[in-house]
Amino acid sequence: MSGGTPRESVAVVVVTYNRADLLDRMLDGLAALTTRPDVVLVVDNASSDHTSQVLAARTEPWLRVTRTEENLGGAGGFALGVRLAYDGGWDRIWLMDDDVVPAPDCLDVLLAQDEDCLMAVREDRSGRLCEKAATRFDLTHPWVIKPKTRMVETDYGTRAAMPERVELENVAFEGFMCRRGVVQRIGLPDPSYFIFYDDVDFAVRARRAGFRIWAVRDAVLVRQLDFDQQHDLAGWKGYYMYRNLFAVHFRYGENALVRAKPWLVALVVVLLSPLRGGRAEARNVIRAIGAARAMRTLPPLSVD
């Protein structure tokens, strides 16, 4: 920061579950930052691998570990971590999954931006841009089945083609940073999502509260695993994908037709299930729409 102004304090929140070796590599990346965070809050979601041994072997004084008694999912882990960061009084809260590694200057680049909501830009291990945060998340038009219609990766193709900052309409909790005032205003991430769309929900709430979100081109975050967004919609993850997608539409659809879209999607899935190889997906979508209706109202998430 220029003019002798002390920099804002930073709490990193890392949520991990059964990926000890990736977590160790990620913590090495945090230790190599040219500007160190003030604290790293690791939420261990009741891992059953050697995560506890990896964490016990770390010697960084800024590392604090909270182990949950059960797996809260990514959503529950981030809700807990953000609560801890907020209660600790740190100025900025930087959210990380356990499979990303920041470039050494990543935190410096983010702290140079005087904005309330920021996103580091992800690339794969070969340096290819793979930032899937949405530049357009359409909750206005009912005929748009998948609301994420544009993203950084498809808009620009390469990091070099990006402007210095790109405005986003949703984020991923892999490199997202916000000031504590954002949490004070809109509350915590919603743990009821368990997995998927908790970051989308938080971004929608932030934007509707008047906060703008910026992806920062030169803040580099390296993803250690390939993206796998083609989940088995007939499996347990498929249930959460449908339920949480429907919940976002029920909560935030900008008109009645968009809020009704989940019913149409569910009907189509059920009707087509005999042609798609079985009825497991149909059972998932029927369960999902009932559960999503129960999520229409945002639960109490205030930090007060």
Which sequence ranges carry the predicted segments?
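Short, acidic, metal-binding catalytic loop of nucleotide-sugar glycosyltransferases
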Residues: 28-37
